[in-house]
């Protein structure tokens, strides 16, 4: 997959996720609220995105060519400004 096709595919996935789950800012806020309870410390929506990127990077260390994980890293990074 080329750089441009990866970006185009990621944009499509983000649109599909928005259709399936709604506004990313609301979803990341809801996740942050749940993680804050679970972890006993305040978590921000940006931290959720960064943690999800880190999870995907850990998986990519095992399989650097896994396309879904690459797309997810790009997608979470793209959402960082939106979910702040």
Tell me what each language-model feature is.
Residues 1-84:
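Intrinsically disordered, low-complexity regulatory regions
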